[in-house]
Amino acid sequence: AHLAGVKKIFYSSSACMYPEYNQLDPDNPKCSEASAYPAAPDSEYGWEKLFSERLYLSYYRNHKMEVRIARFHNIFGVQGTWRGGKEKAPAAMCRKVAEAEDGGVIEVWGDGKQTRSFLYVDECVDAIRRLVESDFTGPVNVGSEEMISINDFAKMVIDISGKKLTIKNIKGPTGVRGRNSDNNLIKE
């Protein structure tokens, strides 16, 4: 991009780059932009996002190429994958509820007390546009501050469906205990 004369670039990062130790309490995750260091993401994906942010910021410092970085928090919406194990939690939950027989059971990984926030894709696109048009350089969270436990989310989907279903918590990957977007910086 630099060699081609690009003046501004956008990088889509992820909340997965935040340190695992800041996300152990499901009721009080610490995901402000300033809490990223000391670095300790819980996965290789998180490390890749963190290293890529550093790379883009170095281009800003060394080559004056403007960079805008959004740390996405659980974006969902139409046209999102909803089958095959690669779907986001909202789509997976909706699929499980839709496929369950009325009076049946859906399985939720872990104890269901882990928390997340979810942002609809249209709101995400608006945030990207505003960020790219701004003068702000540096990573910024793009997500909702409305946190919900996975069990409560499952109950909400069940209620909307009109079905009577039981939630069965099972062993399975759960990720960090809590993740929620701290939007103080983006509000400035």
Show where each model-derived region lies.
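Short beta-loop-alpha junction of Rossmann-like oxidoreductase domains
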Residues: 21-22, 78-81
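Conserved cofactor-binding/catalytic machinery of classical short-chain dehydrogenase/reductase
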Residues: 8, 51-52, 120-123
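Short-chain dehydrogenase/reductase
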Residues: 31, 37, 41-53, 83-91, ...
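Conserved Rossmann-fold NAD(P)-dependent oxidoreductase catalytic core, especially the SDR/UDP-sugar
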Residues: 1-44, 68
